[in-house]
Amino acid sequence: MDRKNDGLRLMDGAGYKKIIIACDSYKGCLTSREVNEAIASGLKEWNAEDASPEKKNLHSEDASPEIITLEMSDGGEGMLDAFLSAMKGELVRIHAHDALMRWIEAEYGIVDDTAIIEIAQTAGLALIEPEQRNPMKATSWGVGEMIMNAYRRGVRRFIVGLGGSATSDCGIGMLKAMGDDWKKIRRECSFVLASDVTNPLCGENGAAYIFAPQKGADAKMVQMLDDRARKFAEVSAKHFGYDRSEAPGAGAAGGLGYAFLQYFNAEARPGAELLLDEVGFDALIQNADLVITGEGHSDKQTLMGKLPQRILEHVLKCRESDKSHVACSQLAGDCKS
């Protein structure tokens, strides 16, 4: 791969026919869609300014490049919008309960036979006022309500984004909301979890010790939550004859990951990778000239499986297998080494 020539080609823009923009949200600033649209708008303006015979930067012959924008998410903020935008699904609005059992309006998506659920729609930390946050009281009941609503509509496959939860109840609230129907759901449905969290359920690296303080827990609460999680896992293991509490991702979303893994035999996958696969990203970039990605804050964590890194891996794989010359560029709101 001639990376030097790629750099020159990226700077002069010559011959671009197809550009794909796939950025994550710039958290607290811009959504994925807003970032993508801003970049696309800038490219179009640059293209228009340089359309004279003497200055043809993005033009190939006399045609403007095709610009495709893809909303992206790592399984947390924006996952629902990303799936529905890329796959043209249906948005469903229901009344459900938040983590403090207050009635709210929640949304999930249906794409073909698959429900796209963000647990933060009901169990989200952002829905709870800072002074009200208490993981000893917060429940995942509303997640169960969303799943039951989709199940009654005939959905049997679920993609569940586990980011942004206010809860540490190990999914007990979700299971209670399902009632005895959880057994039918276990038999009939499949679940894929979108999460980059690999922590186990219990212990110093578990859900309570690592994540509960961010949700309002003090040191005493953390110990109590960890004890409660351990006891729940012991009871569940005796019932099923196996234990998933140590599985990677069991500690995600206050133990909701564990409930899905233990009770529904869910498959856990990195959120960004799951989305890229579901939208057919590899096929989209096969004849592209440039892929632009990015996130709000870029540092060493970016190289540990964050969206820009995964997109770069897909681009390099495409180059190696198809011998194409697609270039990849990252834009970040803030960079640290």
Q: Positions of the model-derived regions?
A:
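N-terminal loops that bind phosphate or other acidic moieties
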Residues: 7, 11-54, 60-337
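Acidic, proline/glycine-enriched N-terminal capping motif
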Residues: 3-5
